[in-house]
Amino acid sequence: MSKDKIIIYQVLPRLFGNKKSNNKSKGSIIENGSGKFNYFTNRALSEIKKMGYSHVWYTGVIAHASQTDYTSHGIPKQYPEIIKGIAGSPYAIRDYYDVDPDLAIKVENRMKEFENLVTRTHKNGMNVIIDFVPNHVARDYKSIMKPSDVSEFGANDNTSHSFSPTNNFYYISDRELDMSLIPVNHEDVAYSEKPAKATGNDCFTHQPSKFDWYETVKLNYGVDYQNRYETHFNPTPDTWIKMESILLFWAEKKVDGFRCDMAEMVPLEFWEWVIPRIKEKFPKILFIAEIYNKDAYRNFLNKGAFDFLYDKVGLYDVVRDVACGYRPSSDITFTLNEVGDIQNHMLNFLENHDEQRIASDYFLGDPQKGIASMILSACVNTNPIMVYSGQELGEEGMNEEGFSGKDGRTTIFDYWSLDKISRWDNNGKWDETLLTNEEKEIRNFYTSLLNLCNQESAIRKGKFYDLMSANYENSEFNSAKKYAFLRGDEKSLLLIVVNFNDAESVVNVNIPDDAYSFFQKEKKKNGLASPLLKFKNPTVSFSDTNALYLNIDAFSGEIFKITFE
């Protein structure tokens, strides 16, 4: 486990550095263009590193189903009716052993271009995370790049059985796939599947709907879902063995971590088996679980051997509600307590490819209003924090790109470019020349905050002390709209205060004597609270009354270093 605080930059290479700005709804790669591995130049990567990031999660690296025709390069043509969007979903994998040809300057050199990206990322002082999608594959999965000693998924399946411990897929016996509920031109439907396979979201019917993950099929890990969830893990299921080979393949490419898509839809026993086997050969490699079931958290850490878990249904949901005014900020204490013993294993974020942008009309409508939430999420513990590319510039996600409608999210299904990223790119200069003052301001905030997360040892490795209980009855605090806590270690003590109110506030924060004892700090008569983010606040003097009077902007916050004269 890293001694530094892990700070992840999630980026969809298809969008990053895209040189075309046509942005035609449902446009092709010819019309709208695509980002490339090579667009992550040393200059671009050094700028990402300067913002404080330790890891880059390159989203959508592994080859996935797409409507773009690469048959001239020996890549099988896909069926449009089983693909979401023109570019396709990065989570409908068509070949686990290949990379997305959209991302290559020269398609025939696509793997080498990815390997060079890994090398460049490492040379710029950052680690590489990619997706591992274990639960499902594209309906028309066909690997052309697999090693010769690896058999194809489903090649040895007995398709007359809806379930068999030795099968890679689940089947709907004697039924043909029926796409009539999917919104496509059914006169042009050419894809056929008999017997039909179960769809990726545990849909065991031959007739998936438009609300199902109809572009994917579920993989069989030895669980008979339609027979009381009976498990068949001995002998080791063939799917397990295939997946171990895939993980080793990418680990050998010097990838430093895997973000495991929908990890809880795969049996815990598989993770318990495979992660230690991978870590035996690659002990520093990270495994991050996309997981939404709080009751499973500890098992996925203690048995499943994951390093980190998504904190979506905990901190993200609560902080979002607080920022939007739907619940009091005091609720943050309760959600932190729920994962108190494992909080250092939770991955915090305010945006990712699944969630709505802070600046969208569906969230806060203004990136500045996300500052309080970001300070809290980044500084509340030693655990990782993640930022989604464009978040640091105030990307709104309010385009109607094609398959992805105007929903406050940046598309993962369509060819597109992001104006703010394109202007930061500035023809490969990766500077602020073309950014607006507002974009520069929010970017500078993220840069300052994320760098502080590792510059200040109290944030990087220190302990946490919640100040809310000491301020519930404080009439000058307002525990429904403010949140305050301490972070400290043997070197320093930090006071962090955030304001979720829509107005600037003068806040009186009580720090009890017990807090100083908790951090083994000697409290003296005269103290100073020096702002590190410097949002208008001068250094504040305080005495042994335990109270600090602080001025906090609307939807903002500050980190104060506490010292004594």
Locate the predicted segments by residue.
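Short beta-strand segments at enzyme active-site cores
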Residues: 55-60, 128-132, 259-260, 387-390
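Extracytoplasmic/secreted proteins, especially bacterial periplasmic and envelope-associated proteins
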Residues: 39, 43, 113-116, 242-245, ...
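C-terminal beta-sandwich/jelly-roll accessory domains of carbohydrate-active enzymes
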Residues: 501-565
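Short, flexible loop/turn elements at secondary-structure junctions
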Residues: 13-15, 62, 100-103, 134-136, ...
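Short catalytic/ligand-binding loop motif for oxyanion handling, primarily in non-cytosolic enzymes
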Residues: 17-20, 64-70, 136-143, 266-270, ...
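Alpha-amylase-like alpha-glycosidases and glucanotransferases acting on alpha-linked glucans and related
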Residues: 2-8, 12, 92-93, 98-119, ...
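N-terminal structural segment of carbohydrate-active enzymes
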Residues: 1-127, 135-137, 142-146, 150-160, ...
